[in-house]
């Protein structure tokens, strides 16, 4: 079963996976421009012709489709989690959750921005996560 923290971190996890896939796609695209033409010469044996450029284009196309699906899943999951966070009634706890799990800010940075000590912010964060736990019914 998923913990509350795992549930909330899904947005950032999806985002990181998408960024990595985009890097992979960029590398493949770069590689595809460096695929050289196969020299045509005498052939001793006939075999099935390979099309390295076509193979590369197909891989890039498949990867772009995968990225598109991941982005769609990311947007759905993000919307779901944001709606869950919006159910937290205390505005301070809402702000902490939004900054931490939607904007990916550290608790230290949030504490600094909001004018609280790190220890107080950690306590408030635990309280905020407990609210989400109640809303979602996790870890009963």
Residue map of PLM features:
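Secondary-structure boundary motif
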Residues: 87-90, 134
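DNA major-groove recognition helices of helix-turn-helix
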Residues: 121-132
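Short amphipathic alpha helix immediately N-terminal
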Residues: 89-103
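N-terminal positioning helix adjacent to the helix-turn-helix/winged-helix DNA-binding module
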Residues: 77-80, 91-93, 124
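Short alpha-helical "recognition helix" segments of helix-turn-helix
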Residues: 109-114
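N-terminal interaction/assembly modules
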Residues: 1-84, 130, 136-140
């Amino acid at each position: 079963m998923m913990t509350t923290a795992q549930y909330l971190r899904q947005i950032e996890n999806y985002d990181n996976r998408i960024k990595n896939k985009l890097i992979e796609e960029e590398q493949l695209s770069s590689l595809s421009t460096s695929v050289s033409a196969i020299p045509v010469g005498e052939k001793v044996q006939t075999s099935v012709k390979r099309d390295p450029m076509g193979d590369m284009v197909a891989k890039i196309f498949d990867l772009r489709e995968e990225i598109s699906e991941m982005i769609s899943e990311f947007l759905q999951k993000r919307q779901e989690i944001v709606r869950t966070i919006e159910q937290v009634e205390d505005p301070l706890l809402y702000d902490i959750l939004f900054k931490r799990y939607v904007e990916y800010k550290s608790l230290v940075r949030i504490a600094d921005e909001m004018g609280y000590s790190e220890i107080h912010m950690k306590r408030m964060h635990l309280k905020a996560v407990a609210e989400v736990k109640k809303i979602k019914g996790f870890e009963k």
